[in-house]
Amino acid sequence: EQIASRPPQLSEAIPVTLDEKQQVHIPIEQVKDGKLHRFVWIADDGKAVRFFVINRQPDKLSLAAVFDACLLCGDQGYVMEGNQVVCVGCGVHMFIPSIGKPGGCNPVPIEDWQQTETEILINRASLEEGLNLFSTIVEIDVKDPISGTQMKNTKTEHKYNYEGKTYFFESEKNLDLFRDNPEKYLGKGE
C-alpha cells in the first residue's frame, strides 16, 4: 500500500547535445512507438531543460515535441501509465492526440522544431524558450575566460551573461575585467 501513495517516478531522461549548427537530432525510429521519450539538454549555465517526444497516433506518424513541464504544475513532469500520459503535479490524464497544443495542463509546446524523413531537429533557441520552466541546475565544469581556471558552475557566484551565453569567473575582479571588454577575452578561454 505504501507504493501506491508515492508520486510516480519520471523515467530517465536521455541527455542530448547541440551539433555545430546548434541543433539537437533525435532519430524518429527511436520515438515512434507511442511511448513517452524523455530527453534533457543542459544549458551552458547548468540549467537542465527536460522535454519529451511522443507519437500521438497509434496507426500513423504524428509526433509532438514538448517541454516536460506545464504552466499550471511547473516542472514536475509527466509519466506514462499504461497507455496514458499523466501530469505528476495534479494527476490529470492527457488526451494524447492533444499533446503539442498549448493550454491547461498540457505540456508546454516546443516552438519551431522540424521533422525530416528520419529525424526530429530542435534548435537551441527553441530549447532556450524552456529555461524559465525548469529549476534544476546540474553541476558542470566551467572555465574562467580571464584566468583559464577550471571550476564548477555551482561553486562560484561570479557569473555574467553576454550575447546569450553565461560565463563564470573565479573572482569579482575577473568578472569586472570581462564586463568592461568581453571581446578581448572571448575565443581565448572557451
Predicted regions and their residues:
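Cysteine-rich micro-motifs
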Residues: 84-91, 165-174
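Extracellular secreted precursors and ectodomains with disulfide-bonded cysteine-rich loops/domains
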Residues: 68, 85-88, 103
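Iron-sulfur (Fe-S) cluster-binding segments and ferredoxin-like electron-carrier domains
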Residues: 77-82, 92-100
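Short amphipathic alpha-helical patches
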Residues: 91-97, 113-114, 171
